[in-house]
Amino acid sequence: MEIEIQTKPFGKMQISEKQILSFPEGLLGFEDYKKFALIEEEEESVFKWLQSVEEVDLAFVVIPPSLFKKEYKPLIPEQELQGIGITDLEDGLMLVIVTVPGEDPALMTANMQGPILINKKTLLGKQFISRNESHSVREKILASAAVEMD
């Protein structure tokens, strides 16, 4: 079934109910908002939008971390993963929130310490905190991608 939502980047749009993800604990810093839609701007784009369906002004640019950091594996205890019904990181869709500075998009960063994991079957999601202290909340995406290509 299609529903209409108001989005920050695209205005009003129709989405499938199957695009609505439930975050029972909200996202870090936004615990009051539990329902989000994962929106693709263009099929070819690696960037997606995680848009709150409850608050039009709450939207995040997200990207799979494997696209620029192949060996990225956050350290998350198995019992925390079970909270969204998965037992292994590979069982979920992993995304990281991207910050794109308006003055220079080449300086965009990703929050590698706070990955989002979504159970693809139940559409339950959670933002975790990686116990790996080498993960940064402001990992430079283009610098990391360049190192990976060397």
UniProtKB/Swiss-Prot annotation:
SUPFAM superfamilies: BH3618-like. The keyword Ribosomal protein does not apply. It is found in: Cytoplasm. Transmembrane segments: none annotated. Its main location: cytoplasm. One of its GO terms (cellular component) is cytoplasm. One of its GO terms (biological process) is regulation of translation. Keywords: Bacterial flagellum biogenesis, Chaperone, Cytoplasm, Translation regulation. Pfam families: FliW. PANTHER family: FLAGELLAR ASSEMBLY FACTOR FLIW. Belongs to the FliW family. Acts as an anti-CsrA protein, binds CsrA and prevents it from repressing translation of its target genes, one of which is flagellin. Binds to flagellin and participates in the assembly of the flagellum. Interacts with translational regulator CsrA and flagellin(s). This is Flagellar assembly factor FliW. It comes from Leptospira borgpetersenii serovar Hardjo-bovis (strain L550). The lineage of its organism: Bacteria, Pseudomonadati, Spirochaetota, Spirochaetia, Leptospirales. The gene is fliW.
